[in-house]
Amino acid sequence: VNLRMIHSESINDSTSKHLLKDLDDILVAPGFGERGIDGKIIAIRFARENKIPFLGICLGMQCAVIEFGRNVLGYKDAHSTEMNPSTEFPVIDIMEEQKNVDKKGGTMRLGLYPCSLKPGSKIMNVYQAAEISERHRHRFEFNNKYLEAYEKAGMIATGMNKQNNLVEIIELKDHPWFIGVQFHPEYKSTVAAPHPLFVDFVKAAIQHKKLQIK
C-alpha cells in the first residue's frame, strides 16, 4: 500500500483533479472544527462522482453527509451546526443529550456502543455480522429529520444504534465502495489484527486499480 497524505487545505476546485485523479481510494480522517472542511468536501465529491472507493471516519462521515446534501439534494447551505450554527439545513447537528452540556472536557459520547447493520448492505458484508460494537468520540450526529430524503436519493443508513436511534454508518447505493462511519475503527485495529473495514477498504482500492489498468 502506497499512502499519499494530502492536506485538505490544499484541495480546491482548481487543484482537486490534479491531486486526486490518480488515487485508488480516498480516506477522510477524523477531526474537529472548520479548518480544511471545504477541501474535505471537495475530495468527497470527487470520490463520489468518479466512483473511487471512499471511507469517512467521524468528521469524514459528517462531511460526506454535507457534500451529498449540497450537491445531490440541492441543500446549498447544508452544514454541521458545529461549524455553522445558523445553517438553513443542519444535516449534522449536536446530539440531543449534548445540547445542555456546558463543560466540554470529557463530556462527549465516549466508549463502546452497539450498532445494528442493515441486511444486504456493503457494511454487513464487511463485518459478516448483524450486530457490532465500536468505540466513539463525538458530539455531533446525523440529523434524522433529513434521513428519508437522503435515503430516497441513494445515501442509506446501514448502521444504527437502536437504543438512541442514531445513524452510525452511511453508504451509497450506486457506488462501488462508499462508506462513512461515525465511530473510530482505528481504535480497534492493530498490525496483527487489522480492522475489517480497513481490510475491505484496501481490497476495494486493489479492485479499483485493476479496473483502471483495463
Which residue ranges define each predicted feature?
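Conserved beta-loop-beta connector loops within the AMP-binding
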Residues: 122-132
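Cysteine-nucleophile active-site neighborhood
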Residues: 18-114, 119-122, 198-209
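Short, surface-exposed acidic
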Residues: 77-81, 130-136
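Generic signal for short, ordered secondary-structure residues
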Residues: 26, 102, 128-129, 180
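Sparse, context-dependent recognition of short Cys/His-centered cofactor- or disulfide-binding micro-motifs
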Residues: 11, 54, 68, 76, ...
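Acyltransferase
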Residues: 1-13, 18-19, 132-168, 172-214
